């Protein structure tokens, strides 16, 4: 789980159609010439704009923290002795999201607010829209969950529904 936790978000792009996959067999990748979309300087500028120019209210930062904490089931054998408001987490999750999810989610929320919604402030909806991408690969379901058809998506939706929006 530590390896997947290092990725900020997971986006499932699916597979190519079989006829496109067949083209990969003899494709000459050396002939591909990519043109950069952004210069290094522009990326540095955008990072500064997002970091300093997009506002994430402290109450929304706490909301992110509570959402991440709610993905973790109570475990008397560890230092995590808090019950999740989600019954799906308590019965189906073996391992919830780590604190790294908080860092990634807060940064991605700023990017999302600016690029997706053209806003200089993060709203709760931004956080909620990103939840499947930030949490999906960080929630490890137990055998009970798999046996009953529980999915990470269902757990995430329940966590979003159970944690009050500030």
Question: Model-predicted segments: where are they?
Answer:
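Short glycine-/polar-rich loops that comprise or flank the Walker A/P-loop
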Residues: 4-9, 136-137
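Conserved C-terminal "switch" segment of AAA+ ATPases
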Residues: 10-87, 115, 119-120, 124, ...
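Alpha-helical scaffold elements adjacent to nucleotide-binding pockets in ATP/GTP-utilizing enzyme cores
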Residues: 2-6, 23-24, 126-130
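Short, well-structured alpha-helical interface segments that form or flank functional binding sites
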Residues: 2, 59, 104
